[in-house]
Amino acid sequence: FCTVNSLLLVCKHVAQYGILGIGMTYVIITGGIDLSVGSVVGLVGMIAGGLIQEGLTLKFAGVTLYFSVPAITVICIIIGIIIGIVNGALIAKCKLAPFIVTLGTMYIGRGLANIRSGGNTFSSIKGQEALGNVGIMQFDSRVFAVGGFPGIPIAAILFLILAVIAAFVLKKTPFGWHILAIGGNEKAARLSGIKVEKNIILVYAISGACSALIGLVTMAQIAASHPNTGDTWEMNAIAAVVLGGTSMAGGVGTIGGTVIGAFVIGIINDGMTMCGVSEFWQKVIKGLVIILAVLIDQFQRNLQAK
């Protein structure tokens, strides 16, 4: 488990949970939840894979358009943001429960991912130089390769950069202060002049963007996209956030804690796999870890209330 290659594999998975966890942290701080992140990962992977492999066919014009990787990246991130905005608008404007809204979009996203390909997989995704759509594998490239050291996954570097930015935004900007205030006491935040609806929509948009980014990264890592990619990943993201000390009741949380939580979940997942623990028992253990983390959070809040 402590070999260089094993640790780098853990870093890859930590980046997946961590980037999802960054968006999830913002959402949970406001007192919400986003169960749709895993489905967005799968949907974006299928859209990007289809655009690279098949392009976009305009039947009325009899032509097929192929997009560059930067264009595909932008398109997919925008799709993730739109899904997040829809979630946020239904929650903030229509006053629907976050659990119900994101549960619904979770099923919609997964269904659309399967409809996109008829349940099939896009495999050996690389693009073609002649079509100008190569380069998707750069999401799975490595940096700082020296001698026998294979290099650090670019996804891990991306995770750390996003974590630093997200931590700064949360602690040093009005937006961060506002979402902490909303999670602490929404009524008081509204009375103080904070635009509650706008900020709630924005945190879900950020969560959608993070999910879309992981959809692209995952597709590059396996050079394929499957409609069920990302299934239950929302649980890993939530576990990382809760283990990092973010309160499910809202108003309390840090990005640094989520980074630590992502490493814990990554080590638990990969450690159990390498030790031969079955997938079924892994789910049981992760579920117990989440419950324990929530119990500790509740215990701490009860102590503070006394």
Name each region found by the language model.
Residues 68-72, 76, 83-87, 91, ...:
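Helix-loop-helix "hairpin" substructures at the membrane interface of multi-pass membrane proteins
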Residues 13, 98, 151-159, 200, ...:
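Loop-to-transmembrane alpha-helix initiation sites
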Residues 204-205, 211, 221-287:
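Transmembrane alpha-helical segments in multi-pass inner-membrane proteins
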Residues 1-56, 89-96, 245-255, 288:
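Single transmembrane alpha-helix segments in multi-pass membrane proteins
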Residues 191-198, 268, 272-306:
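Cytosolic-side transmembrane-helix boundaries in multi-pass membrane proteins
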Residues 56-106, 261:
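Alpha-helical transmembrane segments within multi-pass membrane transporters and channels
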Residues 28-33, 82-127, 131, 169-174, ...:
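Short loop segments and helix-boundary regions at transmembrane helix junctions
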Residues 70, 99-173, 199-202, 222-230, ...:
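Transmembrane helix-bundle core of multi-pass membrane transporters
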